[in-house]
């Protein structure tokens, strides 16, 4: 128990405490001025909205992938199961370079598309979806494996269709695992930096229009401020990091409460 507390303190609690202590020394007025900067606000909007949509996309397609891998046997199944974990193993920079090559104007995929992916918000979305998919698949797949086949047999014997059996019997039990995967994918996307800067590049292009601040994610602003390394830039990096941390914690807390509610609701109906 003592070792656990010490380890947790060194890895998580002490760094977070140091961050909040530095933020407390900035002063509320200066803190607020740093946060309401248009460039920072735009980066928050881009970071959280794109992370949410990427996690939501992964929740849908990650669930389908997990279901297929769990319920069906087919040639190449083990290979696909291993490929799912590839974003875990790849360095984020390697992921960004790979996606940039694939989705660039001359890339295998980008050359076939009638619209641009690299240097756009869509490119950021692609990168965040890529790195978040394994979190959903690996959270949902064990839950699907643990489903009792008797539940489906009983539902079928009572005249329920396969679709109704899925939505009324199976899905409620899988929802907590799906929310867990969504939460992890969302949290991972919020802090992603390496893969995004390669596919987004040094400019943000939306249609034919150059949009100032529109393509910069919050982690990139934090990094830029740390590189400058002046007292003012370090304070702004701290303010942005603390704000992201608080907002992320609130969002994850709400999602976890929904997950807990779903689990209790499912147990009550069984």
Pin down the residues of each PLM region.
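Membrane-interfacial helix termini and adjacent extracytoplasmic/periplasmic loops
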Residues: 28-36, 41, 76-77, 96-130, ...
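Hydrophobic alpha-helical transmembrane segments of multipass integral membrane proteins
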Residues: 10, 45, 49-61, 65, ...
